[in-house]
Amino acid sequence: MTSTKDKIEKLRKILLKYEYFYHTLNQSIISDAEYDYLFRQLYELELKNKELIPSDSPTQKVGSHILQKFKKIKHFSPMLSLENTFDVNGYLNFKKRIKKSIHNNEPLSFCCELKLDGVAISIIYEEGIFVRAATRGDGFEGENITSNARMIDSIPLKLKGIDIPKRLEIRGEVFMLKSNFIKLNKKYKLNQNKYFSNPRNAAAGSLRHIDPNITAERKLIFSCHGCDFFVKTNKELTTHYQRLMKCLSWGIPVNKEIVICSSDIEIIQFYKKIAQKRNFLDFDIDGIVIKVNSLELQKKIGSTTKSPRWAIAFKFSPKERITTLNDVKFQVGRTGVITPVAYFNPVYISGVMISKASLHNKNEIERLNLHFNDTITICRSGDVIPRLLNVIEIRRCDNAKKIIFPSFCPVCNTELLENIEEKLIRCHSGLTCDAQKKQALYHFFSKKSLYVVGLGPKIINELVEKGLVKNPIDFFYLKDIDLIQLKNVGKRKSIKIINSIKKCKKTTLKCFIYALGIPGVGEVVAGKIANYFIKLDKLMNSNILELNCISGVGKIISNNIFNYFSTISNREMVVKLIKQAGIFLNDQEIHKINSEKTYFFNKKIVLTGVFKSFSRIELKTILLSLGAKISNNISRKTDFLIYGNNFGSKFFRAKDLDVKIINQEELNSLIRIKEQ
């Protein structure tokens, strides 16, 4: 048995070594036939001695079970997106902002890398062993793709080398080579299946396939572009580049096209060099990424809620195609904004078929001087968003009809009004305009508002068209018999929707403000307004001066809020929602407490798990009333983690960082003491 064990271990080490050279260093030191022969030997030995198979064996990257669905998984820290620029001025403005946030005399160098056009994922290693992987998702929560990610040959299941942290997060891109993409589509053609439109879509579909064995067949590749150590390594690393090189030493693939630049000229030269090489690479890239190299400066510069301030994507100029304009349709948005949309003969750009593009506003139509049947140039801005660049006027017919922005709403025929300051044209009919009504109602009952399970756009559209609802109040008087008459709505679904409507009555001031759909008032601004006024009646009777005092609420949004509550019909609807429909705002029950004397005053708190005594919203409301600051992410600046049943990864992260942890019993005791 000992000799068999030794033979298995020897074969495993040899194969892992070959995989490291091939996937990480891009060096083939053995033929495919030799590799396959050794692999078969190991597989047959492990098959006879299953007790000797570790999780990091090369054979464990095949033969996994089929997943039924992908569960959601929370990231240890947000997976932020990058700010984009398409020209040198954008990069120079980025550098200027960085200089402002640090001392100008501090040395500044940048780590420049390729911006791979793939799927961003996060991988967690514990004690050097691969334990989980997740997609970016919404940045805070992604899909658990652990079983599929372990099928990617270039992702090591066990790290090698020294100074490996207790827990390590690796972030990077999963992509497919162009050559493999062509082979895959040829295979699909033979089997009469649908084509993948581009390598990125093929990689995304393969990564999320319900069968991990299919993922393994698709030959996906992973490349690391960043990492985070939850516990410091023995050797302190001070730069982003050092971290990447450390990852490389542990067997994690890192793209070799990385340079450290200390001047604008060096960065622009690297950009031009990569732009020239772009079409000769066997994988898609859409630019370069420029990152402040110093980790200390990265921390000092910080991030916004969307992107790090210390990094920017310098993207290549978009690809262009010529086509014919067929029509311009004018869409009415939720807040009445009229948006022109150009429809043209379909064109294929960067692997995607495009047939329409937003023209944004009246000024854009006038700038382009658009006529029907014009020959136009289309591009994908940032290789993503369709954009009408210009008109080739020399090809215009003599009798071509000019496209005119309408003076009346295309849906309700109300006269349109232009806001010069916002550069927007609106229909001010509100809920009497069917287009606004449908979108406003969907927004009112959406996930971040007063969420009603099962109440989607199709059901709302049909309810409006049948005259069953005209405003949010009507939904609270619906009966299951009203819903049953709709398409694809049976008794069971109707009862589910009615019950959900009843439950949504209990909400917070923040959600209620957001649900009203006031122009410019998103989720974050709604939260700031709720925290400032605490009570709805104070908000309804506020003036412009008070609104301007709220951090993050500018002049335009202040005017929008003031105008909304100055409109009699809006005030009447809000009052009816509270008094007649029975909407109950938890915030109105907050006890008047001198928050400065509480245990939680000015403390940064993170919640995890399910709580017995409170819903998550109720607990947040109570803690905010006690002067606490609620955060979604654990860091060294966190004061307390409060946990309930079924807690997640935040609990372990808090332990690693020595953050004070409070259970439900301690929490109840502290809240009771402080509310007395």
Curated annotation (Swiss-Prot):
Superkingdom in the source lineage: Bacteria
Protein's UniProt name: DNA ligase
Reactions catalysed according to its record: NAD(+) + (deoxyribonucleotide)n-3'-hydroxyl + 5'-phospho-(deoxyribonucleotide)m = (deoxyribonucleotide)n+m + AMP + beta-nicotinamide D-nucleotide
Lineage of origin: Bacteria, Pseudomonadati, Pseudomonadota, Gammaproteobacteria, Enterobacterales
InterPro entries on file: BRCT_dom, BRCT_dom_sf, DisA/LigA_HHH, DNA_ligase, DNA_ligase_AS, DNA_ligase_CS, DNAligase_adenylation, DNAligase_N
Cofactor(s) required, per the database record: Mg(2+); Mn(2+)
Disulfide bonds: none
EC number(s) per entry: 6.5.1.2
Annotated binding of Zn(2+), by residue: 409, 412, 427, 433
Keyword Mitochondrion among UniProt keywords: no
Naturally occurring in which organism (per UniProt): Buchnera aphidicola subsp. Acyrthosiphon pisum (strain Tuc7)
Gene Ontology MF terms: DNA binding; DNA ligase (NAD+) activity; metal ion binding
